[in-house]
Amino acid sequence: MGFLKSLFNGKVETPEEKKKEEESRNFDVLKYDGVKALRLGESAHAVELFTRALEMQDDLEVRDYLSQALIHVNRLDEAYEQLQQLAAAEPENVQLLVRMTDVAYMLEDYDRMEELCERAMLIDKDNPMLMVLYARACIGRGDLVNAVAMLTRAITMREDNGDARLLRGEMLLEMGDVESADEDAKWLDDHSSGVEEVLMLSARIEERKGNHEKAVEYYDQVVKANPFHAAAFKERGAVRLAIGDKEGAEADMRSYLELNPEGMDEVTGEYSAEGKEDIGRQVEQAYRNSNPFGLG
């Protein structure tokens, strides 16, 4: 390359120029290999490659990729630091603030979430996604009233906001407003088909209303769609126990424990058919310990 330059440009490439050109090539190779590793799911290797690339040259795109790789390997604080540097370079980028909020949520740093949402709202005050994120921060701090208010704003901005309706329905139910929660559940049921989270919400609402058989029907739909839904087995078992179906409750508890062995801690003593004279009593004790619906 230096010889050709001397022919056509009349000068020889200096050592500094050669070094700079080589570093540029090496940077490009590290960046390309890092992206390839990230796409192949080799996130730890991608982190190493992107880090080496940034040691050679500061590059916003590489920092973006590095933040993604760090999230994949659960190095969340470091991912947040990379996103901070990106946001400093692009302070009006709402999407970056949203990504920072997502990381703060994973870190369970709800105060930071609120701060980021407020910053983003100063830029885009009518963004319903920001309302939902703010609501999640409120929920994390136990402020359900403001969470519902933010979710209602999000729904007012976009009526078909299913995520906001589902979350609002869940929070309303937790607050004891079964009627309002039921309205959200019915809207979701009318506008979606077979969504597990919606079916679970509907089941819990029917149980709160005392409609045990209807609740079981919803739980049946959940486990039919997803035979690995541990919470559905656990909650359906509690309902079955409440209506006197100890055999069904026992079967559900067994399924729950198979899917969630840690749930064994909720059971007093060893839970197995062998060596147990009163398996029904063990089922009742298990549900009293876990108490999903406050059964006495």
PLM feature segments, named:
Residues 19-61, 65-72, 95, 99-106, ...:
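Alpha-helical segment of the N-proximal tetratricopeptide repeat
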Residues 55-56, 89-90, 123, 157, ...:
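Structural marker of alpha-solenoid helical repeat scaffolds
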Residues 65-66, 99, 133, 167, ...:
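Canonical tetratricopeptide repeat
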Residues 1-13, 250-253, 258-296:
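Terminal, low-structured helical/coil segments at or just beyond the last alpha-helical repeat
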Residues 27, 60-61, 94-95, 128-129, ...:
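Helix-start (N-cap) detector for alpha-helical repeat units in TPR-like alpha-solenoids
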Residues 52-53, 85-86, 119-120, 153-154, ...:
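Canonical positions in the second alpha-helix
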